[in-house]
């Protein structure tokens, strides 16, 4: 059995690839490199450049690699951009998820783990918010993800497919070992933007809205370390592989921080001050949202990196590597993104593996042979 990870060259998908490798399981990665980065995929991981909306490509990967589970990360994720260009978000996040699901059903994939978002809740009337709260997304991004959730639930009811929907809160940090971090061109994540400003890659940063009904007037968010989130995906998949029922799960720590609190924490970790400018509210931003993740913890998931300064420290270490060019990825420049290539790698790793005689929780794959071959997708 093998896992297919869409968007595996991106921030969260890439860290999930590392989590699988850390436990001895080698996934297959599919990414179109529109925002992902080829260098984020470790050597030895089979990697295909292509579109999740290409049903025939996905079906070939499923059949050729005996895929039993798909972890679907590939998506557009910027809320203001979704307001400005909603049809592009419905195409990439909803229509292409439909196509991917069709290929999964045709290929008899048993398990589907979906990357969703707390944006489906909109501006909840109370926090921490649980999975039973009525969804009321404020943006096309949130609605595109909620539509995909509905499709997945209906597909599971009709076909032999079980799912886990993971609703992320605000993802932050970087691999503690320094192997990977956030490298997306034009990323809008608060901690990344603040660190880029601290490192003088930006001349200033903006705080969008200071009149929200929160203690200091800025938005409050629940920040979850990307490595803890990656392990949440493994816990969800193990639950499904062990015969567990389909689930919808919040992914957060249950503690909120305001934008000002996060910026002040970045200043302390980076030991530098930087310019902050006030800007109007952005469309689609709720005032405050914090997770109740009790259901995820029932699957055995336990946060290991639940500490805001530590998240910032890990992200800071990564940003310094990017600045120094020591990450192997480098800083993408406007108009010259290193992630913009769309060609198929001329040579790729082919890994033959076998599952050991253990349960799904202790599955270990062994690499018998690594051959360099050219594999054409078209």
Feature roles, as predicted:
Residues 1-174:
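N-terminal Rossmann-like NAD(P)+-binding domain of SDR-like oxidoreductases, especially those catalyzing
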Residues 191-340, 367, 375:
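C-terminal substrate-binding subdomain of Rossmann-fold SDR/epimerase-dehydratase oxidoreductases
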Residues 90, 138-146, 180-192, 222-223:
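Short-chain dehydrogenase/reductase
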Residues 355, 361-378:
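Long, low-complexity, intrinsically disordered segments
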Residues 161, 176-177, 206-207:
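Oxidoreductase cofactor-interface core, primarily capturing Rossmann-like NAD(P)-dependent enzymes
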Residues 350-352:
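Short hydrophobic alpha-helical segments enriched in small aliphatic residues
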């Amino acid at each position: 059995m093998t896992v297919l990870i869409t968007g595996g060259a991106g921030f969260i998908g890439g860290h999930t690839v590392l989590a699988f490798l850390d436990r001895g399981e080698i996934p297959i990665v599919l990414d179109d490199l529109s925002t992902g980065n080829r260098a984020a995929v470790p050597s030895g991981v089979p990697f295909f450049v292509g579109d999740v909306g290409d049903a025939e490509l996905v079906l070939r990967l499923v059949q050729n690699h005996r895929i039993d589970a798909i972890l679907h990360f590939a998506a557009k994720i910027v809320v203001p951009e979704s307001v400005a260009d909603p049809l592009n978000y419905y195409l990439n996040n909803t229509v292409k998820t439909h196509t991917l699901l069709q290929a999964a059903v045709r290929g008899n994939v048993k398990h589907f783990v979906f990357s969703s978002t707390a944006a489906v809740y909109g501006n909840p009337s109370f926090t921490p918010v649980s999975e039973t709260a009525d969804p009321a997304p404020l943006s096309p991004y949130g609605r595109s993800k909620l539509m995909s959730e509905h499709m997945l639930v209906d597909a599971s009811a009709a076909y032999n497919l079980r799912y886990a929907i993971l609703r992320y809160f605000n993802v932050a940090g970087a691999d503690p070992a320094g192997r990977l971090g956030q490298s997306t061109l034009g990323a809008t994540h608060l901690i990344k933007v603040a660190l880029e400003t601290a490192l003088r890659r930006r001349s200033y940063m903006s705080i969008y809205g200071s009149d929200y009904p929160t203690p200091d007037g800025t938005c409050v968010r629940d920040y979850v370390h990307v490595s803890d989130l990656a392990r949440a995906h493994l816990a969800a998949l193990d639950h499904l592989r062990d015969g567990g029922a389909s689930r919808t799960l919040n992914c957060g720590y249950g503690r909120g921080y305001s934008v000002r609190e996060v910026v002040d924490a970045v200043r302390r970790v980076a030991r530098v001050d930087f310019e902050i400018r006030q800007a109007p509210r952005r469309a689609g931003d709720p005032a405050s949202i914090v997770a109740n993740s009790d259901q995820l913890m029932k699957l055995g998931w336990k946060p290991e990196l639940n500490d805001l300064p530590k998240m910032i420290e890990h992200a800071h270490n990564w940003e310094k590597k990017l600045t120094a060019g020591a990450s192997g990825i480098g800083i993408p420049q406007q108009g010259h993104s290193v992630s913009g290539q769309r060609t198929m790698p001329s040579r790729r790793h082919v890994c033959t593996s076998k599952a050991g005689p253990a349960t799904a929780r202790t599955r270990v794959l062994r690499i018998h042979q690594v051959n360099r071959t050219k594999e054409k997708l078209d």
